[in-house]
Amino acid sequence: MKESIFSKKRILLLGSGELGKELVIESKRLGLEVIAIDRYEKAPAMQVADYSRVIEMGDKNILKNVIKEFKPDYVVPEIEALSIEALKELEDEGFNIVPNARTVEITMNRDKIRDLASKDLKIKTAKFDYIFEFDDLEKKADEIGFPLLLKPLMSSSGKGQSLVETKNDLQNAWKQAQANSRGKVKGVIIEEFINFDFEFTLLTVRKENGENIFCLPIGHLQSNGDYQCSWQPLEIKESLIIEAKRMTSRILNNLNGAGLYGVEFFIKGSEVIFSELSPRPHDTGMVTLVSQNINEFELHLRAFLNLPIPRIDLIEPSATRVILSNQEYLNPIYEGLYEALEFEKTKVLIFGKPVSRKGRRMGVVLSSNTDINLARKNADEAALKIKVSTT
């Protein structure tokens, strides 16, 4: 008989942002104990966790010590900026890293996941190369062709990503990528710009027995690589979804760790082009909080806890739109909440970040409707009602 009592299971969350906050909430519903770790105080997930700690997660010894102190049953990374050496050593010592240390390492570095997909598994991607010195950039840019994309090898939420139109833009794009690179890696990936028709996320649950379960595709729009809105379901040809599932299965069969994965694709004509993969709940997947009978955070938990995952159903077509700050505030407040909640079947999530910055994601609006276009319209208009401010 499978173990069914989880009240004494302990999860240590590495990174405590808005996605981590929702994961903690779902963990508490299952009776789990959660420790939330981040590099700053009062991070969103810390506000709902049992315990929290502020540390430098990129320091191997500090990270190992705090994990050994709390002795969690599961170590669950939510971000890329952490010491992979610590996780690999702890896994060798018997700690359970979700989904596993190898997958965390491959997906936190754009070069490793791109090499796995393109070179090892022969999956179609944009043309790309890696540059570690600015002097090599101009020559490689001529080979790739303009416009092109320049990204840090390690970053999150699109930070440091630039669309480079001409040679004159290379210097500034290089500086931007260097300034926003996480960890010790200072190289960049130079990438062909694909004038795609649309992009989407395929949330995929990998079970311990190796089965892959797919959610309905999620459409999304980005600005400078950062998610702005999403909607589910996305209208897309069945043949394209079949190919995306095939590509996803090939990658996950190689990574082979239980959990939820956010897999991003471009569509150009009849081509399916692999973009990126995250081994954890995905920002575009926040729409599943209202669109699905089992949201992405609960799916992640069920997968790595080896709990049953029944059929994933669409409750109703739904959409999201982020709430952005236009400047820096300490202890920000939110105006227009009343007006935003006047929209039918609409919810507002305020993440609770202690400091706002220009362009920082501070919350999200979720809206449902039998008409997906109306759900998107309501989410967009409700988000415009909310202004981040200060007293």
UniProtKB/Swiss-Prot annotation:
Keywords: ATP-binding, Ligase, Magnesium, Metal-binding, Nucleotide-binding, Purine biosynthesis. GO terms for molecular function: ATP binding; magnesium ion binding; phosphoribosylglycinamide formyltransferase 2 activity; phosphoribosylglycinamide formyltransferase activity. One of its GO terms (cellular component) is cytosol. The keyword Ligase applies. It comes from the Bacteria. It catalyses: N(1)-(5-phospho-beta-D-ribosyl)glycinamide + formate + ATP = N(2)-formyl-N(1)-(5-phospho-beta-D-ribosyl)glycinamide + ADP + phosphate + H(+). Mg(2+) binds at residues 264, 276. InterPro entries: ATP-grasp, ATP-grasp_carboxylate-amine, ATP_grasp_subdomain_1, PreATP-grasp_dom_sf, PurT, PurT/PurK_preATP-grasp, PurT_C, Rudment_hybrid_motif. Its EC number is 6.3.1.21. N(1)-(5-phospho-beta-D-ribosyl)glycinamide binds at residues 18-19, 78, 283, 353, 360-361. ATP binds at residues 110, 151, 156-161, 191-194, 199. Pathway: Purine metabolism; IMP biosynthesis via de novo pathway; N(2)-formyl-N(1)-(5-phospho-D-ribosyl)glycinamide from N(1)-(5-phospho-D-ribosyl)glycinamide (formate route): step 1/1. GO terms for biological process: 'de novo' IMP biosynthetic process. Residues 115-305 form the ATP-grasp domain. Homodimer. Involved in the de novo purine biosynthesis. Catalyzes the transfer of formate to 5-phospho-ribosyl-glycinamide (GAR), producing 5-phospho-ribosyl-N-formylglycinamide (FGAR). Formate is provided by PurU via hydrolysis of 10-formyl-tetrahydrofolate. Belongs to the PurK/PurT family. This is Formate-dependent phosphoribosylglycinamide formyltransferase. The lineage of its organism: Bacteria, Bacillati, Cyanobacteriota, Cyanophyceae, Synechococcales. The gene is purT.
